[in-house]
């Protein structure tokens, strides 16, 4: 049965989240756009404490680790509300890549790893990063990997070159995907290894400028060179050779979180679009932009596209909750490109309606435009998802 009803408890929670975002986070956006992220950390720490007191910390984090332990659908709804501002997920403790790292540490970590890395991470006392993408290898095909972890006594010695490692700057540890058995079949060659960032040989070379902005701390994307970086073999996460499988397992739920966050961005851009269309007077007789048919068309198209993308995403989340990630993989693959493209169109229309103002940092739109164009690239480019989904559909017709 298909039930779109949100429980009363969840509805009340979402209203609290909306109110918090409006009152506590939106006023910080101008500082976020102009200051270093590091400079905002004391303020954000206070906001995080407020969230914890309200018992809204970690919607994705299991209850036994101090989070809310929400279902995929409820977390999706929560994520949509947080997505309206770039600060939402961070302040509520469910930001990528930590959310995915918490998930795989919870599923695959041993007791020592959980105590040392998972618990402080879940409490928001430390941050982490995830090192998969490599400079010379195709990001969409993680079976192709040059970073190696070679056994030496009781240790691994890691050598390799990673980049686009979100939030590496300021992280306590990195979960690194590296080849541990080059002779194994392609999908069984790599493993996940926990590498504390203060380990000699872990070299964060730079924060890569994204469309001109290099950022700092959590709001950055690092390039890392591993030079004979030695960590104990007990830092292996899960079983050896399961790196690819764990990466896939991490990405499924992650795509739901991303899509719902993007829908939050769509909603925010749509609000700004409509407000601007109604208030921007364009003729002496007082007619606003909203009186133009083309602007009305953008508004109607945006509303329909957001609603369609939202229902598709909630359906995919419901499928993960009911039949599991593997059976829902086509639903998840499809929403990844549908929602990313919807977001790009809605942001673009909102920016256009703002005219020259849309290109400045006086609104949040230019920030969204810069940073969310990548949505069609990371976690599987549009073309890869489309090709995979199409192949599975065609199989049914053979």
Positions of PLM-derived features:
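Hydrophobic, small-residue-rich alpha-helical packing segments that form membrane-like cores
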Residues: 137-141, 145, 151, 156
């Amino acid at each position: 049965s298909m039930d779109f009803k949100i429980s009363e408890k969840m509805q009340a929670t979402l209203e609290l989240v909306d109110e918090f975002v409006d009152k506590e986070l939106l006023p910080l956006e101008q500082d976020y756009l102009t200051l270093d992220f590091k400079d905002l950390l004391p303020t954000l720490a206070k906001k995080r404490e407020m969230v914890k007191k309200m018992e809204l910390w970690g919607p994705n984090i299991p209850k036994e680790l101090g989070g809310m332990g929400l279902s995929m659908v409820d977390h999706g709804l929560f994520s949509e509300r947080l997505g309206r501002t770039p600060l939402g997920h961070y302040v509520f403790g469910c930001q990528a890549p930590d959310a995915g790292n918490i998930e795989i540490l919870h599923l695959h970590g041993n007791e020592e790893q959980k105590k040392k890395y998972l618990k402080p991470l879940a409490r928001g006392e430390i941050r982490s990063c995830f090192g998969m993408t490599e400079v010379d290898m195709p990001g969409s095909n993680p079976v192709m990997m040059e970073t190696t972890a070679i056994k030496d006594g009781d240790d691994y010695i890691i050598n390799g070159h990673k980049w686009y490692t979100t939030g590496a700057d300021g992280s306590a540890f990195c979960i690194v995907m590296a080849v541990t058995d080059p002779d194994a079949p392609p999908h069984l060659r790599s493993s996940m290894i926990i590498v504390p960032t203060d380990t000699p040989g872990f070299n964060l070379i730079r924060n890569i400028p994204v469309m001109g902005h290099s950022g700092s701390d959590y709001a950055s994307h690092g390039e890392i060179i591993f030079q004979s970086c030695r960590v104990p073999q007990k830092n292996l996460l899960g079983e050896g050779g399961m790196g690819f499988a764990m990466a896939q397992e991490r990405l499924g739920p992650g795509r739901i979180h991303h899509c719902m966050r993007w829908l939050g961005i769509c909603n925010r851009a749509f609000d700004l679009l409509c407000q601007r269309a109604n208030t921007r007077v364009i003729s002496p007789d007082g007619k606003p932009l909203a009186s133009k048919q083309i602007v009305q068309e953008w508004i109607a198209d945006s509303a329909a596209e957001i609603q369609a993308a939202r229902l598709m995403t909630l359906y995919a989340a419901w499928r993960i909750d009911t039949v599991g990630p593997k059976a829902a993989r086509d639903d998840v693959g499809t929403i990844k490109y549908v929602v990313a493209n919807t977001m790009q169109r809605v942001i673009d229309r909102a920016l256009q309606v703002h005219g020259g103002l849309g290109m400045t940092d006086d609104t949040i739109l230019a920030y969204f435009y810069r940073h969310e164009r990548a949505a069609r690239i990371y976690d599987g480019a549009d073309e890869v998802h489309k090709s995979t989904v199409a192949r599975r559909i065609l199989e049914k017709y053979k």
